């Protein structure tokens, strides 16, 4: 499972290079000054990232089975 998750993570991260706005705006983080986006990796995980000029900053790989309030505190 770890190898599959890693490969999915790399595939999605590479896709962000071509299409940085492919992820949805992250509802849980709308109150922040930055526009956090998320991109689903698999059925349990997603990348949470921001676009800063030409850079894509991945803030966390989030396990969606966790309490959503933890995401607000973590990022």
Can you describe what each PLM-predicted range is?
Residues 1-8:
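Conserved GNAT-fold acetyl-CoA-binding loop/helix
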Residues 4, 14-15, 47:
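Noncatalytic linker/hinge segments flanking ATPase motor cores
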Residues 6, 31, 40, 59-60:
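A general, composition-driven signal for non-globular sequence regions
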Residues 14-41:
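A short, surface-exposed loop/turn module that caps and links secondary-structure elements
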Residues 41-75:
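Enriched for short, Lys/Arg-rich terminal
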């Amino acid at each position: 499972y770890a190898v599959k998750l890693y490969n999915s993570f790399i595939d999605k991260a590479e896709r962000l290079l071509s299409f940085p706005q492919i992820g949805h705006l992250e509802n849980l983080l709308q109150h922040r000054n930055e526009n956090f986006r998320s991109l689903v990796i698999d059925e349990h995980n997603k990348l949470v990232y921001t676009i800063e000029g030409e850079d894509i900053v991945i803030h966390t790989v989030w396990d969606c089975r966790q309490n959503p309030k933890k995401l607000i505190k973590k990022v």
